[in-house]
Amino acid sequence: MLGFAPAPGRPLFVLFGSSIVQFSFSNGGWGAALADIYARKADILLRGYIGWNSRRALQVIDKIFPKDSPVQPSLVIVYFGGNDSVAAHSSGLGPHVPLEEYIDNMRKIADHLKSLSEKTRVIFLSCPPLNEETLRKSTSTVLSEIVRTNETCRLYSEACVSLCKEMDLKVVDLWNAMQKRDDWATACFTDGLHLSEEGSKIVVEEILRILKEAEWDPCLHWKAMPTEFGEDSPYDLVSSSGQSTVNPSDWTFHRTIQWD
């Protein structure tokens, strides 16, 4: 049993998924950006597992998200589907999960997460597109041939979005969000599959948009959340007048992107 132990009174956000989640704290990734945006507002916990599919996630979801944990997450952001969509290997091994089973697995994952508490909110991320040519060149020779195509990514992405509409879940449609950029194929990936800093910016923007627009109580958008120990203090920096202090708790000058 893993369980969670955030700072007292601070909400917990869990990022759960495959390599796009595991790598999200590297190279300007979207997880690292969220951790910065929510500094002193929420604890961002990484539960990313490279190579995983929805079948493997479902097998251990009770261990990763135990229902008897004394602390339950306020938000879980979930990504599975890219590995599920890989073509089936002739050996029967590998990450491929048939589309109908993928849909059923994601439904069960959503049901489990929604049952954790009345305040646990869920956002799914759908499959992004690929740069197939770059991916073919970057795939390690230690692996058997891996067949990933944009056509199957599209099918699994559309299935995820449709499921979320059916279940009244929030979803980031990465398939379409990425392709709003004319240069998405070259700008949004490091290896044709995993997200670059530019690709991660799109993920962050879409997540923040959902959190801002969602009619959730309490609101989980960063601007609506209190800053931990954000009260004025005589120990803050002294103002130019020399007669008072300036509270820096919510300063964001260090960010190259001023997120909405």
From Swiss-Prot:
GO terms for cellular component: endoplasmic reticulum. This is GDSL esterase/lipase WDL1. Induction: Down-regulated by wounding, drought stress, salt stress and treatment with abscicid acid (ABA). Highly expressed in panicles. Expressed in shoots, mature flowers and seeds. One of its GO terms (molecular function) is hydrolase activity. Involved in the organization of leaf cuticle and wax crystals. Glycans are attached at N83, N150. The keyword Hydrolase applies. The active site is at S18, D191, H194. Residues 1-35 form the signal peptide. InterPro entries: Iah1-like (IPR045136), SGNH_hydro (IPR013830), SGNH_hydro_sf (IPR036514). It is an enzyme of class 3 (hydrolase). The keyword Kinase does not apply. It is found in: Endoplasmic reticulum. Disruption phenotype: Mutant seedlings show a severe growth retardation phenotype and die within 30 days, due to increased rates of water loss. Belongs to the 'GDSL' lipolytic enzyme family. Keywords: Endoplasmic reticulum, Glycoprotein, Hydrolase, Signal. It comes from Oryza sativa subsp. japonica (Rice). Its EC number is 3.1.1.-.
